[in-house]
Amino acid sequence: MSASVTSSDGRGPASPTSSSTGASTNPATSGLAAALKGATLAFQHQQRTAAKGSDTAVPRPHGGSRVPTPGTGSVSTSTSRTVGGSNGARLAATLAAREHSPPTTSKNEASRVVTSTPSSSSSVGSAGRTNRQELHGQATGGSSQQQQQQQHVEERANDHAPSKRPAMRSRRPSLASLSSQAVDNSHSHPPTPASAKPSSEPKSVSWIAATLAATSIAPTTSLVAMFDGKQEEAETATKKKKKKKPRPASKTQHHQTLTSPSPTPSEGLSIENQCGTGGVPSVASGKSKVAPKPKPKPRRDISLSTVESIKSSTGAMGRDGKSSNQEQGETRNRNGDVRDKPSREGGKVTVTGAKDIVFEGTSERRSQQKVPATPRSVQSKQGVEVPTDKRPSTPPVSQHAQISETTIISPQPRRVVSTPRLESSPAVPKTYKTVTNPRPDNKPTIRKSSRVVSPSVDQSQTIRQSAETGLGDRHTSRNSTSSDETFVSASSSPSPRPQTPTKELERVRPRLDRANTSTSSRASRVSTPASVRSPASQTRPSPVLRPGTGLYSYSTGASPTPEMSLDSLTNAMIASNLASSRLTALTQTSLESPGLPPVPPPRRGHRHHHLPHPHLRHRTQSPPHARPLIPQRTADSLPVRTGPSRQTEHTQPASLLKTLRAPRSLSDDEDLRLQTHRHRKKHLGGKKHAHNEGARRRWRDEMTIRQRRRYEAVWASNRGLFLRPGFAFEHPENWQPLPPPDDSLGQVDLSRAWESPEADLVVNVVVRDIWSRSRLPVDELAEVWELVDRRKCGALDKQEFVVGMWLIDQRLRGRKIPTVVGEGVWESAMDRVLSVNVKAPKAHKGRTKGHLKGVF
């Protein structure tokens, strides 16, 4: 048989310190080899005894061969082993621990009560027996003694087989943390020479072999037993109690065994054999061998030291919020399937395959202490049935069997403080009560659609909040999506929503129309069929604040929940359409007639109706109720638009078509002539078809007095600018210019030429600036300049400037620029007084003659 010894975490060889406290003084290789040899001999003897057909209480499993598991680092064999915890390692451990125990009394029986604690994996009873074994180690030894011890252990294991497997899960830490604690305990309690002396004897070697075989089993319960932040407190409390109560030198090894990290093989047997469910001792029955030292039934009387150690070890476990009665329910994972739980049907124990246990929210330190899920002991396949007697033997130690191997003998503590729930926690029985009993408020339960996504971490927090506020009478478990998947209620009436979230939702909802929104929202909730609503809103009626918006909603994101009623949405859409249409109408009206609304079409027979009083035409004085008010953008942006409903006044259009009307003439005489021509009466007779030469418009070769006066005004305002004496005229040699006038009062413009011939001239730069305002091309302005500049001195006098202005005005009227300016134009531009012909009045001939005759 090949065997290998590794540490509990599978990383390397197990140190003697982590295996036992007795081997810490002599970690030699020969001792380990002897220990392995002793364990091998004990196990082979057990196989030979079972092959001979000896009557033992532990049956062989069907196909229960040991499969080596990588990662556990425990002793692996290819031969078959027994199922009820009686494998070779445990038999060797029990053989070494119980050989020299004295006849059982009430005190000794209480000392054998084993309770796994978070701070230590050893038991009080095994510690006492280990002390006694080491004290008598010098007088015993040999393989024959090991065979005798093995038979003795088989009898005790047969007598103390448990009638029911405890369902309490142990809270045992990993072996790595316990080994470090064992080193501290070995330093704090040094072994006496009496206890350290038999460590090299043959019995000590067998004890080391049993301990190594038991310690190499990976504690699967460490996956579930790791609790949040309570391990260090339990270890500290245990160390303080050991320091406060010193023991004599003969009991020093007993203290070391109490805190030893290596669980002895008798641990699992003693707890299962002596304790039933709830700490009640089970009565041994069935076939058993005649033992040389029969022991009476165990009692419930426990010594004071055992009770104190149990209280200190289960202090952290009591705060975890899990009682043993609640732990007996079915353990469900996320998918809802039942985890490994042995059930008795027809005298058979059915053990399903173990599954990996998953933690939620564990820290990094806890994940580092995880031990591989495959245990050291034999694991049964799924569906393997083990026949049992009336009193079933110990079931195979699987992953969940080791989880629930701890039982509290003391009265069950009350769990007050609850820690965060683990993923492997069983479902609350309250969930199943709602399946059989109808709900009081007749709420319809709808089968969940496949489109609904399983709740995330944020949604699980919402579930806890809804359970705490009491809005729902059903507790929703995190392990299952919903408990409504298994049934459909017979009630078909829609369930009303709670009023508390409705009021809270109405407070946050935007108040577009408060009355319509509050009324229609309640109606829409009642009228909405239950099949349309999201299932998450029924199981979690508490409102959830959306991160992006300021609104509360009941939806989980799978199906939309109407946050606003249909009436509110319709009102909002209509209001937006009206606002946009009104704004467009106002814009068009303001473009057509900025201050007035469009005029309705007039009636027939009232086309030429005129109001008698002009002050009545003002629309602001009309009654305001005659015409409805037109919506305005602001109060001050537009004038008041009120007036009578029917207005017969005709308003002049802003503009007419330019193709039907001639532009207004700039000259007054031309407009007057056109006006008189239009109102001239038509001739009744004469040449009807003859062309009237005088009626057509001609270009005139002279300017009117009105035109000349307008042009002279422009000349007067720009003459003499930028000119000095001697600019435009040649003076004689003895000519002296006049002194400039006195400008003490600031009445004279020094930029103009004073009294001199240059004062009546307009310089070329000024002429160009004035003529360029006509927007005629530069070449045409140059042609006009060449026609009027007769002196070629760079400046124009009064007559030249006036003729040039007239030519530009004629070009703007559409006439071409002539090649030569006529004499009539120059004469009309001269400043002269026209002669007036006054006719003498007509008189009677006689009277005139007589009168004249009388005068002369």
Swiss-Prot record:
Job of this protein: Positive regulator of phosphatidylinositol 4,5-bisphosphate turnover and negatively regulates signaling through the cell integrity pathway. Involved in rDNA silencing.
GO biological process: lipid metabolic process
Membership in a protein family: Belongs to the IRS4 family.
Disulfide linkage: none
Location of the region described as Disordered in the Swiss-Prot/TrEMBL record: 1-204, 230-563, 589-672
Record field: compositional bias (Polar residues): 255-275, 303-315, 396-410, 451-468, 478-488, 644-654
Gene3D superfamilies per UniProt: EF-hand
Name the UniProt record assigns to this protein: Increased rDNA silencing protein 4
GO CC list: cytoplasm
Bias kind Basic and acidic residues: ranges: 152-162, 329-347, 503-514
Coiled-coil ranges (or none): none
Gene from which this protein is expressed: irs-4
Residue ranges with Basic residues bias: 239-254, 603-620
Keyword Transport: no
